[in-house]
């Protein structure tokens, strides 16, 4: 309770928003239906009570959220006062003037405590356009009990060839036990988040140095062929409907021997209140193939204020509250230390309670800090971004490619047909946008 009062007082005083100094307002927040955000929604009732302000929550599935907030910000619709956006959108939208700067939350916010690579990725021309709520890389989670029973040992750095061997040995569909769970739901931030890293590991790239698409190149063909075979033979039925949340549920309920996905999942699958296998799991690095470059992604979910908001001061008060050092401690005390938002503040990793509760903490931190968006694969590229390409056109391009690959996974077309369709469309898009001369 002391932490709660301190955090509320700090966020209100720093922005002149203590009850009685400003009229109470209603604000609308659009966010994703991930576990960390559900906790934020739950705890925000205390912020409402203390400040008198009210929150209208719009909590959406990941693909739907992206569509809604992108449409709203591009059309200046003004539906939202706070948006949950990724490390892809923040610098692009900030540069467009679509977001309000958020580098004025007060000295006590301690901007220096934010992890530098994450803060830098949200900054354009010296202005911060979003504050990180949690950050993630990707890694391989696996069932150590199943590995032990099968006489298998997971190496510190697995290859995709080894992952395929393990998946074959650990699949028992009669028990609904699948060797591997991977994202199959189409979307630039769903199946393509994972596939971007897999293609990188196979030595592939989105574009050559002249911005010509490389989607029908041999590395892409090999990576996607292996993905379709791996998930088709050893994954759950209906994998094309499974994104992050669906696979997290499958893993936490004991249906996946391995799961390659976001490091942020660790806080839930290691929590015995949310996971049936919390004491049976371990983790290691994401698999590699031809190279380790770009084999683990880099992603942040962030809170930002659209430039159209008429309630920016109240919105900033909430941002300060929800992304502060004291909020991290409040989550630890109320929800368990394993559940605190990862990857945003240096101080989180110095907390003895977090170090004790989260055996994955140091591994996750190093994965986040070591991701290099400027060198995402074996060969040179004209873009930055590990699992995405940091250009405005990528949202549409990535989703189209994801849809083609999802259709191949469903058996509706061959991998070659999917990649040829993707190559043709993306080449057309990049020519129209002026990248290809």
Predicted feature residues:
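Extracytoplasmic "Venus flytrap"/periplasmic binding protein-like
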Residues: 46-117, 121-123, 129, 149-151, ...
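Short, solvent-exposed loop/beta-turn-alpha elements that line the ligand-binding surface or hinge
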Residues: 100-114, 184-187, 202-222, 271-276, ...
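Short, well-ordered beta-strand elements
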Residues: 25-34, 53-58, 81-82, 129, ...
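Hinge/lid segment of periplasmic solute-binding proteins
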Residues: 86-137, 162-164, 179, 191-194, ...
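Glycine-centered hinge/linker elements that transmit conformational signals in sensory
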Residues: 166-169, 210-241, 282-286
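Conserved C-terminal helix/tail region of periplasmic/extracytoplasmic solute-binding proteins
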Residues: 49-50, 54, 148, 372-437
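Periplasmic solute-binding protein
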Residues: 90-98, 117-155, 183-209, 297-306, ...
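C-terminal lobe and pocket-closing loops
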Residues: 264-277, 289-399
């Amino acid at each position: 309770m002391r932490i709660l009062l301190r955090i509320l007082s700090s966020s209100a005083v720093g922005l002149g928003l203590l009850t009685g100094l400003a009229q109470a307002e209603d604000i609308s927040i659009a966010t994703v239906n991930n576990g960390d955000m559900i906790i934020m929604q739950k705890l925000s009732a205390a912020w409402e009570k203390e400040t008198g302000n009210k929150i209208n929550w719009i909590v959406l599935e990941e693909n739907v959220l992206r569509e809604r907030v992108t449409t709203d910000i591009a059309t200046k619709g003004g539906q939202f006062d706070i948006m949950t956006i990724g490390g892809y959108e923040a610098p692009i939208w900030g540069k467009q003037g679509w977001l309000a700067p958020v580098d004025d939350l007060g000295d006590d916010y301690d901007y220096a405590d934010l992890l530098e690579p994450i803060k830098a990725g949200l900054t354009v021309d010296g202005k911060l356009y979003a504050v990180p709520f949690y950050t993630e890389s990707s890694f391989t989670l696996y069932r150590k009990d199943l590995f032990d029973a099968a006489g298998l040992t997971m190496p510190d750095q697995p290859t995709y060839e080894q992952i395929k061997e393990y998946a074959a040995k650990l699949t028992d569909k009669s028990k609904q036990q699948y060797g591997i769970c991977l994202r199959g739901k189409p979307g630039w931030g769903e199946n393509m988040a994972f596939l971007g890293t897999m293609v990188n590991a196979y030595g592939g790239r989105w574009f050559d140095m002249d911005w010509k698409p490389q989607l029908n190149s041999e590395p892409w063909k090999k990576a996607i062929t292996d993905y379709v075979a791996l998930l088709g033979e050893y994954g759950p039925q209906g994998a094309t409907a499974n994104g992050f949340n669906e696979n997290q549920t499958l893993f936490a309920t004991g249906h996946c021997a391995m799961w390659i996905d976001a490091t942020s999942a660790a806080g839930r699958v290691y929590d015995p209140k949310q996971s049936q296998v919390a004491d049976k799991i371990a983790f290691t690095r994401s698999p590699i193939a031809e190279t380790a470059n770009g084999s683990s992604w880099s992603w942040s979910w962030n809170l930002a204020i659209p430039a159209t908001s008429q309630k920016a001061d109240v919105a900033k008060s909430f941002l300060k509250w929800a992304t502060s050092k004291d909020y991290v401690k409040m989550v630890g005390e109320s929800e368990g230390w394993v559940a605190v938002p990862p990857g945003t503040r240096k101080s989180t990793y110095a907390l003895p309670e977090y170090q004790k509760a989260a055996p994955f903490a140091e591994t996750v931190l190093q994965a986040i800090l070591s991701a290099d968006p400027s060198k995402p694969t074996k060969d040179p590229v004209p873009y930055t971004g590990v699992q995405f390409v940091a250009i405005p056109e990528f949202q549409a391009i990535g989703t189209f490619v994801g849809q083609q690959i999802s259709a191949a996974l469903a058996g509706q077309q061959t991998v070659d047909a999917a990649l040829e369709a993707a190559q043709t469309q993306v080449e057309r898009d990049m020519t129209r946008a002026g990248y290809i001369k």
